[in-house]
């Protein structure tokens, strides 16, 4: 016996898996308890890493690169 899925235009409730849902509550999200100081520190660290990476990418004239 072959069964077919009947397609309709009826709107039903969405199927949501709570642990995987992209619209989960903020309390269940990872790092949701980070405070402003933690975020500012992360932004400052990212800026420092970016600045040091760009300064290392420019080699000096007439010098040998070890990388």
Swiss-Prot record:
Major subcellular site: membrane
Membrane topology, record value: Peripheral membrane protein
Annotated GO CC locations: prospore membrane
Signal sequence annotation: none
Keyword Ligase recorded: no
Post-translational modification: Phosphorylated during meiosis. During meiosis, exists in both unphosphorylated and phosphorylated forms with the highest degree of phosphorylation occurring in mid-meiosis.
Biological process per Gene Ontology, one example term: ascospore formation
Residues annotated with Phosphoserine modification: 24, 32
Knockout mutant characteristics: Defective sporulation accompanied by the appearance of pseudohyphal-like projections.
Pfam (any one): SPO24
Keywords noted in UniProt: Membrane, Phosphoprotein, Sporulation
Superkingdom field: Eukaryota
Keyword Phosphoprotein attributed: yes
Compartment(s) of residence: Prospore membrane
Induction summary: By PDR1 through its PDRE-like promoter element.
Role summary: Required for efficient sporulation.
Full protein name: Sporulation protein 24
Organism: Saccharomyces cerevisiae (strain ATCC 204508 / S288c)
């Amino acid at each position: 016996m072959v069964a077919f899925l009947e397609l309709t235009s009826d709107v039903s409730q969405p199927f949501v898996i709570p642990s995987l849902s992209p619209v989960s509550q903020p309390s269940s999200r990872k790092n949701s308890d980070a405070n402003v100081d933690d975020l500012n520190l992360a932004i400052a660290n990212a800026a420092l890493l970016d600045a040091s990476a760009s300064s290392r990418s420019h080699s000096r004239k007439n010098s040998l690169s070890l990388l």
